[in-house]
UniProtKB/Swiss-Prot annotation:
Binding of ATP, residues: G83, D104, T111, N112, L113, H114, R115, K128, D172, N173
GO molecular function (one): URM1 activating enzyme activity
Keyword rRNA-binding found: no
Organism encoding this protein: Anopheles gambiae
Compartment(s) of residence: Cytoplasm
Active-site residues annotated for this sequence: C230 (glycyl thioester intermediate), C395 (cysteine persulfide intermediate)
Cofactor: Zn(2+)
GO biological processes: Mo-molybdopterin cofactor biosynthetic process; protein urmylation; tRNA wobble position uridine thiolation
Stated name of the protein: Adenylyltransferase and sulfurtransferase MOCS3
Its EC number(s): 2.7.7.80, 2.8.1.11
Pathway: tRNA modification; 5-methoxycarbonylmethyl-2-thiouridine-tRNA biosynthesis; Cofactor biosynthesis; molybdopterin biosynthesis
Binding site for Zn(2+): C213, C216, C288, C291
Length: 441
């Protein structure tokens, strides 16, 4: 009987705790709303909490009270809540930017956590903008954090960017860079652009006080197959931290109208050597399609079509080969691997990635760089000629393998050998279709 009473008491207490937690959340939300209302109606002076919080930067001659008020009145949109966006948003929030918008279409994944440090294991599966908002609101409850869980497109870009003073480009694909550039030029807003790949980073400011825009320097996009993002090429988290923090710094300097803004200059960071370099960029192009006196581009266009690639870094798939030059992972598995038929499988990932995981069947590792530079093509040709076996090529996502097949096919035909074939979708397709326990990265 006593045991039943104990269980009943536990249930009552648990219900009470749930009720109290709900009430607490409601009170916290009321407090946030009240603070935001107070902040919006008190932008001409700093309160005691703000003076204490920002005192270490207010005492700088470059900032002062008036500078802090400028930061309080300012609004910044951070496009991308990843490796660059996280540190940029973090330092902007810490500095007291009054209103910060965070735009991202993605959800938090385990692969993000080594470099996107506003996200945690507890927020895996949540939208990135929700994760960032939660962190920043705990850091600084006196500022306003707006979230936009959406993919930036030609249809929504102008409306999303228009309410903000400065835009931070923390994205990882070419199409979005062109879109952001053109939208910022049309809206007359400065664009703080950063990028990070492997152990290197870059930073500049476009469309600021007569400086060049992105199109002035790059009027036409690069070939899709030549573009590498951090998902394919890799990146060290500390590199994105450095560049993202510097993006916040440039944004703050713009808001304060301070000297030294990186307009017309490109900052290069070499993480391997811990070295910074500043390069002078070409001036604003008089015939630029979007920022010249007589622009030919006066509205946003289809940037995926313009660049020949998707405006996302999520498993962007190239189609470089004819269907007869490719094979699905299912057909390869059932028709060759599981059937035990002799063949040669070539894995074109680099040695580090190859060491992480390999398909069964003892594939030969020949990195794509060694194929495209012909360093090891003779080795492959000799092996194929000696064995007289069909050759299949695999990579991580099915893009580099197509480049390899396109390069190797004419060389194979010259020796009267059947051209190699590409495994569609690469190892990602293998995990999704054949073996869900195969590592994905």
């Amino acid at each position: 009987m006593g045991e039943m009473n104990g269980e009943g008491q536990i249930e009552v207490l648990e219900n009470d705790i749930r009720t109290l937690r709900k009430q607490l959340q409601e009170k916290v939300q009321q407090l946030k709303t009240l603070k935001k209302h107070f902040q919006k109606n008190c932008i001409t002076k700093l309160n005691n909490d703000e003076i204490a919080r920002y005192s270490r930067q207010i005492i700088l001659s470059e900032i002062g009270v008036q500078g802090q008020l400028k930061l309080k009145k300012a609004s910044v949109l951070v496009v991308g809540a990843g490796g660059l966006g996280c540190p940029a948003a973090l330092y902007l929030a810490g500095a007291g930017i009054g209103r910060i918008g965070v735009l991202d279409y993605d959800e938090v994944e385990l692969t993000n956590l080594h470099r996107q440090l506003l996200h945690t294991e507890a927020t895996v599966g949540l939208t990135k903008v929700t994760s960032v908002q939660s962190y920043l609101e705990q850091l600084n409850s006196q500022i306003e954090i707006e979230t936009h869980h959406a993919q930036l497109t030609s249809e929504n870009a102008l409306a999303l960017l228009e309410p903000y003073d400065v835009v931070v480009d923390a994205t990882d694909n070419v199409a979005t860079r062109y879109l952001l550039n053109d939208a910022c030029v049309l809206l007359r807003k400065p664009l703080v652009s950063g990028s990070a790949l492997q152990l290197e980073g870059q930073l500049t400011v476009y469309n600021y006080r007569g400086g060049p825009c992105y199109r002035c320097l790059f009027p036409t996009p690069p070939p899709p197959e030549s573009v590498t993002n951090c998902g394919d090429g890799g990146v060290l988290g500390a590199i994105t931290g450095v560049i993202g923090a510097l993006q916040a710094l440039e944004t703050i300097k713009i808001i304060l109208s301070n000297e030294g803004v990186l307009a017309g200059r490109l900052l290069l960071f070499d993480g391997q050597q811990s070295a910074f370099r500043n390069l002078k960029l070409r001036p604003k192009k008089p015939t630029c399609a979007v920022c010249s006196e007589a622009p030919t581009l006066t509205k946003l266009i289809d940037y995926e079509q313009f660049c020949g690639m998707r405006a996302t870094d999520k498993d962007a798939a190239l189609t470089l080969l004819e269907p007869c030059e490719r094979i699905s992972v299912r057909d390869y598995h059932d028709g060759w691997l599981a059937a035990g038929r002799d063949h040669l499988l070539v894995d074109v990932r680099n040695a580090n990635q190859y060491e992480m995981c390999q398909l069964p069947g003892a594939p030969v590792n020949v990195p794509i760089e060694d194929i495209l530079s012909n360093r090891r093509t003779e080795e492959l040709l000799a092996r194929a000629q000696q064995a007289q076996l069909p050759v299949y090529v695999v990579c991580r996502r099915g893009n580099d393998s197509q480049l390899a097949v396109r390069h190797l096919a004419p060389l194979f035909r010259e020796r009267n050998l059947p051209a190699p074939r590409d495994l569609i979708g690469g190892l990602h397709a293998w995990t999704k279709t054949i073996d869900p326990n195969f590592p994905i990265y």
